[in-house]
Curated annotation (Swiss-Prot):
Family membership: Belongs to the UPF0149 family.
HAMAP family xref list: UPF0149
InterPro entries associated with the record: YgfB-like (IPR011978), YgfB-like_sf (IPR036255)
Protein name: UPF0149 protein plu3602
GO CC list: cytosol
């Protein structure tokens, strides 16, 4: 099973969030968690940050908290994967293209929120400033109900690919790969 295929089912996860009275969609939650990870957040503080940003500072129920931990772990593994397996949690391709466009815009906006919380001065980084500008524009994604759905679908796929690469570039800019961290931790201790 590929890492991409191990993301939860969008509709099911979205319903779980709604049932728990979380104001974020599944796409927005995944964007937020992805942004925190890409900003270099590696410790358990991510949970408190997600509580603050998505649930008025209140902890989630145990079942939802477990699903969020699993989502974070899958996302972390996919970002750290050398095969670039990172994917976005969005509605299925068979779903309405307008819903997918809205979900992508929500994912991007919450990704930028998470990135900004983890890296408050991310805009100062020259190597990613253009990417951040592009993501901000994508977050404002708009369409007309009368737009050709086929054209919009093709454009959406291109933008989606760009967002995936942009997120991975942010991850590379702000974090060290897991293998480097493991190597640092495995250094012998000098007594």
């Amino acid at each position: 099973m590929s890492i991409q295929n191990s993301l939860p089912d969008y509709q099911s996860f979205d319903e779980t969030l709604h049932q728990q009275s979380v104001a974020l969609t599944a796409a927005e939650m995944h964007g937020l968690i992805s942004g925190l990870l890409c900003g270099g957040n590696r410790d358990s503080s991510w949970q408190v940050l997600v509580h603050d940003l998505a649930n008025d500072g209140l902890a989630f129920s145990h079942p939802l908290a477990q699903k969020l931990r699993e989502l974070r772990e899958i996302t972390f593994e996919s970002l750290d994967d050398s095969n670039f397996a990172f994917g976005l949690l969005l509605p299925d391709e068979e779903d309405n293209v307008f819903e997918r466009a809205d979900a992508l815009a929500g994912w991007v906006n919450h990704f930028l929120l998470g990135l900004g919380v983890a890296q408050p001065k991310f805009a100062d980084r020259k190597e990613i400033s253009e990417i951040i500008g592009d993501l901000r524009n994508i977050g404002l994604l708009g369409y007309e109900e009368g737009d050709d759905q086929e054209e919009l679908s093709q454009a959406l796929e291109e933008v989606l690919e760009y967002v995936q690469v942009a997120a991975q570039l942010c991850y590379i800019a702000f974090t060290e790969p897991k293998t480097v961290l493991i190597a640092k931790n495995d250094k012998p201790t000098l007594h």
